[in-house]
Amino acid sequence: MAGPQSFTPPSVTPSRTKKRFTLAEANKSLPYVSRIVKDLVTINRTIATQQQKIEKKAGKDRGSSEKELVISKDRLQSLVEELSAVGAELKDPRSGLIDFIGRHKGHDVCLCWRLGEEKVSFFHEMESGVAGRQPVTGLDESD
């Protein structure tokens, strides 16, 4: 049997009117952001496990488990909102992948960070996603 699947909170699709970060600002926010993301990844795993347990239970035996699941989903949603309030965008709740909106050669890009990385080391074009990650050594923040 495969491991727990992830739960995708409804608000992971960001609006593009978020705060813009310089690379330095994004890195400065990481101590706080990483704590949020660590909790988010953990609660996401918990939700996946809870969902699997509920699927295996019959009718009335599901009651308390479903209540626990609702509480966990509410906690996850509040963590997503907390992350969003900072200006970071959740991309993958399983790996803790997030983006900050930054600038490169006069246009918006995503400064890309994943839980466990010491600093923001990559960026990518808005539509290319993580597959298009490039080292920040090539980032030109001037307009």
Each PLM stretch: what is its role?
Residues 68-83:
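Short amphipathic alpha-helical coiled-coil/interface segments
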Residues 21, 28, 64-67, 71:
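A structural signal for alpha-helical segments
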